[in-house]
Amino acid sequence: MAVCARGLRCLGTPAVSLRLAASRSYATTTPPDPAIPNTPGAAATSSPAKRPRTSFQDKLNAGPSFSDFLSDKDDARILDPAEAYALKTALVGPKGKKKEYTRLPPWLKTSIPDSNNYKRIKNDLRGLNLHTVCEEARCPNISECWGGGSKSAATATIMLMGDTCTRGCRFCSVKTSKAPPPLDPHEPENTAEALSRWGLGYVVMTSVDRDDLPDGGARHWAETVMKIKQKAPNILVECLTGDFDGNLEMVALVAKSGLDVYAHNVETVEALTPQVRDRRAGFQKSIRVLKAAKAAQPSLITKTSMMLGLGETEEQMWDALRQLRAADIDVVTFGQYMRPTKRHMPVHEYVRPDVFEFWKEKALEMGFLYCASGPLVRSSYKAGEAFIENVLKKRRAESTGPGSASVQDVATGDLVR
């Protein structure tokens, strides 16, 4: 504007006419104050009127600075455990119909996923038409697992046989249908390709339940494991399967396919199973599945997981742990149940971190090989993978031989039949 003004002055045009023209051209220009003479000298010396101070601005200026929030010198602001674990409530809803809800505790809050590893894994999955339980089940750990600090640290749990389940458990957000789409015949190959790209040492796979299939998808499972082992022989594979509707022959087929960890979740204590899981599932049925897997392949590590916060009692927890240990299950994990949507069963209790630590100690005392326990721990959570990976590598080093090859030969024969 100043350049234009100098140019117009050279042509003998008054600066006042320039200002009037500009005010007509730009509707957002502040009109001149009538109390100030409309002269070139006044325009040069006047300053814009200051906005009135507000009470909010005064409070903000009087409050602590940003550096005060970052400083930990003030010991008075450090919370004791009782204060830190205290749950806060909020009234939500229209006036006159407000309901009291318990706010999410701070120990259950996670960061929003945004990293190069996260984007890379997501692109690989979309390009190969693969699904993950991380997305379908709305896992709170997705930013940590997908956004690992390095390529080898990032991982995702592949969900086989599509994204639609034939069962409807009250805690799960995966889509349900009595007649889901047919299996993708390219999925075993695509899964093996994706996992080999990521260069991981340990992978976890799970699946939806497919009660619409005669074998429950067991042969699809076995084929996928064998494809992975062909592309990456040294990779360790954990399979979190369904119960195949209690068909123990299909359980044995998957157990002999070459996997390293056979996982199947009991989800909750026996007394709450009818209210939490689909009517076709059962606590004792799940125990039989894990026993059959170990019987078919004794070298396998067997694993199960339970959610806390569903209303279970301490005695029910003790009973569940005793039954799991009697079934020779090696690994157990505990995590907080978090309601995916309003259509699912509500959270009965947000269990404190020290309670999770208590059950971890008790599980290890009972003889479990490993226990991962914490509010954000999930059955396919990578917190325990490093420990299990080291155990498996140690076992592999101690007993090298044709065992793994014969396992795959048996599985291949079963697939042909």
Curated annotation (Swiss-Prot):
InterPro entries: Aldolase_TIM, Elp3/MiaA/NifB-like_rSAM, LIAS_N, Lipoyl_synth, rSAM. Belongs to the radical SAM superfamily. Lipoyl synthase family. It catalyses: [[Fe-S] cluster scaffold protein carrying a second [4Fe-4S](2+) cluster] + N(6)-octanoyl-L-lysyl-[protein] + 2 oxidized [2Fe-2S]-[ferredoxin] + 2 S-adenosyl-L-methionine + 4 H(+) = [[Fe-S] cluster scaffold protein] + N(6)-[(R)-dihydrolipoyl]-L-lysyl-[protein] + 4 Fe(3+) + 2 hydrogen sulfide + 2 5'-deoxyadenosine + 2 L-methionine + 2 reduced [2Fe-2S]-[ferredoxin]. Disulfide bonds: none annotated. Keywords: 4Fe-4S, Iron, Iron-sulfur, Metal-binding, Mitochondrion, S-adenosyl-L-methionine, Transferase, Transit peptide. Its EC number is 2.8.1.8. [4Fe-4S] cluster 2 binds at residues 165, 169, 172. Pfam families: LIAS_N (PF16881), Radical_SAM (PF04055). PROSITE patterns: RADICAL_SAM. Its cofactor is [4Fe-4S] cluster. Transmembrane segments: none annotated. Residues 148-369 form the Radical SAM core domain. It comes from Uncinocarpus reesii (strain UAMH 1704). Pathway: Protein modification; protein lipoylation via endogenous pathway; protein N(6)-(lipoyl)lysine from octanoyl-[acyl-carrier-protein]: step 2/2. This is Lipoyl synthase, mitochondrial.
